[in-house]
Amino acid sequence: MEEEKKKSRVLIIGATGRLGNYLTRFSIESGHPTFALIRNTTLSDKLKSLSDAGVTLLKGSLEDEGSLAEAVSKVDVVISAIPSKHVLDQKLLVRVIKQAGSIKRFIPAEYGANPDKTQVSDLDHDFYSKKSEIRHMIESEGIPYTYICCGLFMRVLLPSLVQPGLQSPPTDKVTVFGDGNVKAVFVNDVDVAAFTIKTIDDPRTLNKTLYLSPPGNICSMNDLVELWEGKIEKKLEKTFATENQLLKKIKETPYPDNMEMVFIYSVFIKGDHTYFDIESCGGVNGTELYPDVKYMTVSEFLDTLL
């Protein structure tokens, strides 16, 4: 009976990043023996804080097979939270996990739109195809997995009310992309971490994609504008930008400066977060599985911008 209750041992890769730090803390708070792979053993304030919380720090990197193998041998679950630009650096990790043969679950660095469902492959400079490549490698190697798809972090697009180039929401005029009715999903990164840690020992999420689509966080541009107008008690002057106008702007703007607009095109024109049904494509809904997890709503996030 005691063995059944034993919590999985967890290795976090990318523990000093924003999401990785949240993941590490929730893992420890949930009672999982937690390890963090770190490049430098010199204790920064962040690392000291993790160590003081009970995290075991292991020196190593995604390029060093020996250190990876040693770290993987100590745990049951591996969670990667490395930045998207380094996503292909997980290839050696996948091979090491395969060779170890003892990992019960691998959660790769995704935490966005489902890369196999997005419709912007000609625009995104392989942003999503690299994530798909890691997925297909995991599955072809027969590694147990859970993928976390959370739409967009709230700190992406929302602080400007989806106005490219702005750092804060508009107070007079707003540009609405498309007809303004296509819905996107936004989740705060600390909440993404909380849901992710919940999946670790849950058989319902094994070899599944966990979608986070919290009620109150699925919003169209028209919804966002209406919410914001209510908070500032003022109507904004709306201008509508067509799909072709947005595409033209994306193509005229050099990479990576155009990626903000690529995300806007993906979610508010193509509907890449919401055009498919979660259950019918084999996914599971995080807010239904874990109704106890409290999360920030879009309205609450907009309150922080006032």
Curated annotation (Swiss-Prot):
The keyword Lipid biosynthesis does not apply. It comes from the Eukaryota. Dimer. The active site is at residue 131. Pfam families: NmrA. Probable reductase that might be involved in the reduction of lariciresinol into secoisolariciresinol. In most plant species, a single enzyme is able to reduce both pinoresinol and lariciresinol efficiently while in Arabidopsis, PRR1 and PRR2 show a strict substrate selectivity for pinoresinol. One of its GO terms (biological process) is positive regulation of leaf senescence. InterPro entries: NAD(P)-bd_dom_sf, NmrA-like, NmrA-type/Isoflavone_red_sf, PCBER-like. This is Probable pinoresinol-lariciresinol reductase 3. GO terms for molecular function: pinoresinol reductase activity. Its EC number is 1.23.1.-. It comes from Arabidopsis thaliana. NADP(+) binds at residues 14-20, 39, 46, 135. Belongs to the NmrA-type oxidoreductase family. Isoflavone reductase subfamily. Keywords: NADP, Oxidoreductase.
